[in-house]
């Protein structure tokens, strides 16, 4: 019997993907249905429901649940859920009771079918204010919400495809069933998830190694879905992480894998979502550092820590491993934190993925205080392949300029 944390909201994963003859029959039927084009974010959510990553959801949220999640971070049933999972359309023709085919807006491939249980309109500004704490269009999450269609469609779904994630990422792309089987095979009971949309710099390595000391293992879990302009692509990031694991971690303490969601950049609320679906993947802990899932200056550096203090004790089984500021200290001669380093600010070099990207985009060398040389080499090769006119200007937020 597995000793891992249970899936969210119950004792079993609830993947919504069809297989075998059922899959083939549903695909044939879907070809005849009215199509709903899905954004990259919606596609990621569909695939996540398909593999059980969003257990126990059975489809896209209705108006009551959208409102409850925005306002209370719970569904109408009382189930904890921090961010609305919704599907939108501009179609005037779709009505309650219709069965529709959900297609990838970029490829037109059919990825799911849905029976529409409700068609409703939302106050997009309300969702932005409650989830993202802003309605400014400079926030990429706000842009996503404001770009949604006029109506939301609710209903249960049947998932018919993983998109191109298995083909593109191979063994790096793992489902919750697969990670749970891996952990069980290793005999791990406690696993810390390390969420990353960046290559791992020295501070990241430091946090992961502390987690290895605390837990049986660490899952370095990379975003494989969409990111904002200027972020490093998943294949490059994965290669950089692989060389770090190979050269600087003990064998059989780390699992590197990825998941299909787009980043929402919702800061504290997204940290809660990250913990929730890591529970479904079998992780007992989520590493939460500075400005988790944040963007620019929209959230304080430890807002994602504090939000775990205000949710109900039984909201999640997976708990946060909270870490203070980490940095390179010249006097300590290595990575330290506010809790371990007694020295002054002039002795410290603050590290961030944003700063790493800024240095590389300006064709500068990464100092060893920032990055292991093997990691730096992978990233330098990638940035050297980008034409100067195609590079995105990277700006540091106030957390690093004050």
Swiss-Prot record:
CDD domains linked to this entry: ATPS
Catalyzed reaction equations: sulfate + ATP + H(+) = adenosine 5'-phosphosulfate + diphosphate
GO terms for MF: ATP binding; sulfate adenylyltransferase (ATP) activity
Pathway note: Sulfur metabolism; hydrogen sulfide biosynthesis; sulfite from sulfate: step 1/3
Domain of life: Bacteria
Keyword field: ATP-binding, Nucleotide-binding, Nucleotidyltransferase, Transferase
GO biological process, any: hydrogen sulfide biosynthetic process
EC number: 2.7.7.4
Pfam families hit by this protein: ATP-sulfurylase (PF01747), PUA_2 (PF14306)
Keyword Acetylation: no
Family affiliation: Belongs to the sulfate adenylyltransferase family.
Name of the protein this chain belongs to: Sulfate adenylyltransferase
The organism's taxonomic lineage, starting at the top: Bacteria, Pseudomonadati, Pseudomonadota, Gammaproteobacteria, Candidatus Pseudothioglobaceae
């Amino acid at each position: 019997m597995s000793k891992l944390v249970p899936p969210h909201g119950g004792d079993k994963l609830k993947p919504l993907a069809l297989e075998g003859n059922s899959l083939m029959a549903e695909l044939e039927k879907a070809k005849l249905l009215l199509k709903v084009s899905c954004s990259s974010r919606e596609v990621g959510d569909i695939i996540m429901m398909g593999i059980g990553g969003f257990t126990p959801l059975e489809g896209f949220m209705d108006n009551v649940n959208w409102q409850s999640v925005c306002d209370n971070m719970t569904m109408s049933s009382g189930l904890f859920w921090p961010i609305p999972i919704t599907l939108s359309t501009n179609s005037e023709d779709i009505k309650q009771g219709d069965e529709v085919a959900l297609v990838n807006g970029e490829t037109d491939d059919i990825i799911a079918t849905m029976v529409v249980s409700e068609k409703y309109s939302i106050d997009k500004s309300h969702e932005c204010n409650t989830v993202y704490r802003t309605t400014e269009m400079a926030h990429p999450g706000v842009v996503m919400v404001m770009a949604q269609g006029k109506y939301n469609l609710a209903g249960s779904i049947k998932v018919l495809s993983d998109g191109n994630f298995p083909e593109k990422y191979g063994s790096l792309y793992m489902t919750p069933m697969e990670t749970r089987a891996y952990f069980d095979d290793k005999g791990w009971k406690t696993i810390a998830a390390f969420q990353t949309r960046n290559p791992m710099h020295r501070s990241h390595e430091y946090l992961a190694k502390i987690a290895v000391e605390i837990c049986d293992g660490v899952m370095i879990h990379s975003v494989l879905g969409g990111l904002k302009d200027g972020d490093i692509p998943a294949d490059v990031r994965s290669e950089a992480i692989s060389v770090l694991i190979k050269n600087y971690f003990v064998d059989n303490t780390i699992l590197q894998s990825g998941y299909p969601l787009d980043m929402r950049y919702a800061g504290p609320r997204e940290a809660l979502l990250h913990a929730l679906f890591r529970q479904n993947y079998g992780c007992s802990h989520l590493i939460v550092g500075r400005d988790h899932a944040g963007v620019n200056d929209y959230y304080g550096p430890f807002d994602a820590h504090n939000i775990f203090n205000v949710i109900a004790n039984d909201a999640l089984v997976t708990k946060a491993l909270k870490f203070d500021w980490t940095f390179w200290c010249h006097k300590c001669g290595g990575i330290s934190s506010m809790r371990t380093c007694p020295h002054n600010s002039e002795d410290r070099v603050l590290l961030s993925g944003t700063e790493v990207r800024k240095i590389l985009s300006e064709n500068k060398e990464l100092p060893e205080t920032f990055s292991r040389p093997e990691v730096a080499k992978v990233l330098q090769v990638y940035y050297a392949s980008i034409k100067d006119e195609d590079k995105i200007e990277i700006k540091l937020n106030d957390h690093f300029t004050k």
